[in-house]
Amino acid sequence: LYAVGCKARVLEIWTDVPGMMTSNPKVVPTARTISHISYKAALELSHFGAKVIYPPTIQPVVAEGIPIYVKNTFGPEAHGTLIEKNPPRSKDSVIGISNSDNIALLSLEGSGMVGIPGFSSRLFETLSQNDINIILITQASSVHTMCIAVSEKDAEKAREAADKCFAYEISLGKLNPLKVEKGFSIVCLVGDDV
């Protein structure tokens, strides 16, 4: 916010890492620093686990088109990462790999979903009213199954809320009770053409 309010030419974020990395160096020892990256790719990496930037706090800077430099406090001479609207195009299709652990998959299934509008919006509204963030959504082409990913800590609350919301359809056998599976991770490939 200060960078926007001051009409800064650049925002510098000083941290304990050399910049945004191609992957988590604790998991992948050969991870490299990304020298240039677009706002979009940086936000995607951070959404799925890269902790160098926090999307809500940099949204005003992104909206104003202010470049962001991520630099290392312990190695200030290093280039770091420049996050900007139109960075030089990378020779690699995949710029980075990010992940989120402790994910639960919630599956809403049943023949009663086919051809009936509104199931998705009802589920999303119910989860929203219960302060449950949806991380990922997928729906089978048959429209018979919808699967969403949430944090494991929200899984049981989501099950209770969804089963209550769809109690009538479940009682008629048109839908199955929400199926919860835990112990998953999401791996995200980020790149200009990915």
Task: Outline where the language-model segments fall.
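C-terminal catalytic "cap/lid" subdomain
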Residues: 1-194
